[in-house]
Amino acid sequence: MERGPQMANRIEGKAVDKTSIKHFVKLIRAAKPRYLFFVIGIVAGIIGTLIQLQVPKMVQPLINSFGHGVNGGKVALVIALYIGSAAVSAIAAIVLGIFGESVVKNLRTRVWDKMIHLPVKYFDEVKTGEMSSRLANDTTQVKNLIANSIPQAFTSILLLVGSIIFMLQMQWRLTLAMIIAVPIVMLIMFPIMTFGQKIGWTRQDSLANFQGIASESLSEIRLVKSSNAEKQASKKAENDVNALYKIGVKEAVFDGLMSPVMMLSMMLMIFGLLAYGIYLISTGVMSLGTLLGMMMYLMNLIGVVPTVATFFTELAKASGSTGRLTELLDEEQEVLHQGDSLDLEGKTLSAHHVDFAYDDSEQILHDISFEAQPNSIIAFAGPSGGGKSTIFSLLERFYQPTAGEITIGGQPIDSVSLENWRSQIGFVSQDSAIMAGTIRENLTYGLEGNFTDEDLWQVLDLAFARSFVENMPDQLNTEVGERGVKISGGQRQRLAIARAFLRNPKILMLDEATASLDSESESMVQRALDSLMKGRTTLVIAHRLSTIVDADKIYFIEKGEITGSGKHNELVATHPLYAKYVSEQLTVGQ
C-alpha cells in the first residue's frame, strides 16, 4: 500500500524544519559515532592545511633571491613541506573514512532496529522498498556528508581564510581586490545551490518509490510470470523510471553547471587579479616573488572553491535523506517490555464490545464479543471478508480496538507486556511465513535459548514433518530458499506447525489451510493441527466441517458482526445463513 496523502503532506510540511542543523545533529547523535576518529581526522586535516599555507610564504624570498643563485636547502624544504602536507592529508582522509563507516554502520543499525519495532499499521502505509531505500541510500548520503563533505569544507575554509591572511600580509591591495570579487562569485552561485537542494529532495523520494515498486514486483515474481504480467509490471515501473530520468537530467545539469560556472568565475577573477598584480610590479609596489607567492595562494583557492561547491551539492542531496531518517526515527514504536508478565495458562480470553477500523474509513468490526474458556476450541466461521482475520490481528496486538477491550483472565491484554503476550501465543496461518535460511533457523526463529537436534526432531515428529526433513540432503541444515520456495506448501505448513510446537503456546490461533493443498498433504497437516490443539486454548478460522463440529463454541461472523453463536447443531437449527454456509462453503474432511 502506498503512503496516504496525510503522510505525504506531513513530509512536505516538515521539509524546512528537517533540514535544520538541530535535526542533523540529532541524527548524528542517534548514530553514536566514534567522535575520537572525527577529532583526529579534523586535527590532521588542519595540520596538513597549515603546512600547505607555509609553502607560498617560503617561495616569496626564494624567488626574489634567484638573482644570487639557487638555494638548494630552501628548495628541498619546500618540496618536503609539500610531501608532508600530502601525507598528513592522506592520514586525515583515512581516519575520516573510518569515522564515516562507523557512522553509517551505527545509523543503519539504529534505523533497522527502529524499523522492526514499528507497529504493523506503519507498514500498511509505507512500501517495503521505500524503507529499504531509507536503510541503504539515505544513510549513505548522510555518511558522505559528515565523513567527506563537512571535513573537506572545514579544511578548505581554513585554507581560504589562511590564504587571505597571508595575502594581506604580503600585499593588501591585491588581496582587497580579491575580497571584493568573492561575494560577486557567491551571488552567481546562489541560484544554482538552491536548485540543487530541490533536486536532492525530489531524487531521494522518487528513488525510494521506484525501489518500492521493484521490491513489490520481484517479491511476487511467480505471480507476475504465471499471470503473464511482465508487460504490466514494466509499464507500472516506467513512470517512476521516467521520473528518475527527468530528475537525473536536472541533476546532471546541476552537477554540470556547478563546477564550470564556479571555475569560470574564479578564472575571470584570477585573470583580473593577475593583471592588477603585474601593474603593481610595474609601479614598484610589489616584487615578482610576492606576486608568485600570491598566485600560489590563489591556486589554493581554485581548489578550495570547487570543494566548497561540492559541499553544498552534497548538503542539498543529504537534506532530504536527513529529513526522512529523522522522521522515521521519530515514529512511535512498539514497547515490548512495558507491562505485566502474566502466565496465560488457565485464563479465559474475552472480547467485550470491540469495534475496529483501520483508519477513518469504513468500520471493519462492529460490537464483537466472544469468550474462550481455558483449553476450549473456539471456531470463527463466515463468508470471506467478514473480519475473522482482523480479530486475529487484534489478538496479536498488531492493532488496537477503536472501542471496547480484549481481556485475559479479566485483565486487559494491553496491560500485559507485548513480549510476554506474544511469547505465549502461537499462530499458524493459511500461508505460513517461512524465512530464507535453514530448517533449523526457521524452527527456532524468534526463540531464545539453545535447542538440541533431539528437541527439533521431536517437534518435527509431532508435526508429521520428520520424514520429509530426513530425506533432504542436509536435513535440519537444508536451505529452504526465500519464503520457503524450495519446499512444497504442505511441507511449509508442517514446518510452521513444528515451530508452533517448539514455542509451546498457551493460546493457539489457526487459520485452516486446506484448499491449496493436495489430499495427502491436507491429511498430514490436519493431523498435525489436531495434535497441536490438544490441551490449549484454541481459536480457529474454520474451513472444515469437522473443525466446526468439534468446536466448543462457534461464532458466525458476517460483515464485521457476530450474527450467531453456539454449538454446530444449535446454529444449523436457528441460523439459516449458517446452515447455508456450512452446506456450500465448508470442506468435508475424512
From Swiss-Prot:
Membrane topology: Multi-pass membrane protein
Location in or out of the cell: Cell membrane
Transmembrane segments: 35-55, 79-99, 150-170, 176-196, 261-281, 292-312
Reaction catalyzed: ATP + H2O + xenobioticSide 1 = ADP + phosphate + xenobioticSide 2
GO biological process, one term: response to antibiotic
Organism superkingdom: Bacteria
ABC transmembrane type-1 domain: residues covered: 38-317
Residues reported in the UniProt entry to bind ATP: G382, P383, S384, G385, G386, G387, K388, S389
Domain ABC transporter per the UniProt entry, residue ranges: 349-584
EC number from the UniProt entry: 7.6.2.2
UniProt GO molecular function: ABC-type oligopeptide transporter activity; ABC-type xenobiotic transporter activity; ATP binding; ATP hydrolysis activity
Cellular component GO terms, alphabetical: plasma membrane
Keyword set, alphabetical order: Antibiotic resistance, ATP-binding, Cell membrane, Membrane, Nucleotide-binding, Translocase, Transmembrane, Transmembrane helix, Transport
Keyword hit for Manganese: no
InterPro entries: AAA+_ATPase (IPR003593), ABC1_TM_dom (IPR011527), ABC1_TM_sf (IPR036640), ABC_transporter-like_ATP-bd (IPR003439), ABC_transporter-like_CS (IPR017871), P-loop_NTPase (IPR027417), Type_1_exporter (IPR039421)
PANTHER family to which the protein is assigned, alphabetical: ATP-BINDING CASSETTE SUB-FAMILY B MEMBER 10, MITOCHONDRIAL (PTHR43394:SF1), ATP-DEPENDENT PERMEASE MDL1, MITOCHONDRIAL (PTHR43394)
Subunit structure: Homodimer.
Family recorded in the similarity comment: Belongs to the ABC transporter superfamily. Multidrug exporter LmrA (TC 3.A.1.117.1) family.
Biological role: Efflux transporter for a variety of amphiphilic cationic compounds, including antibiotics.
Name the UniProt record assigns to this protein: Multidrug resistance ABC transporter ATP-binding and permease protein
Organism of derivation: Lactococcus lactis subsp. cremoris (strain MG1363)
Upper taxonomic lineage: Bacteria, Bacillati, Bacillota, Bacilli, Lactobacillales
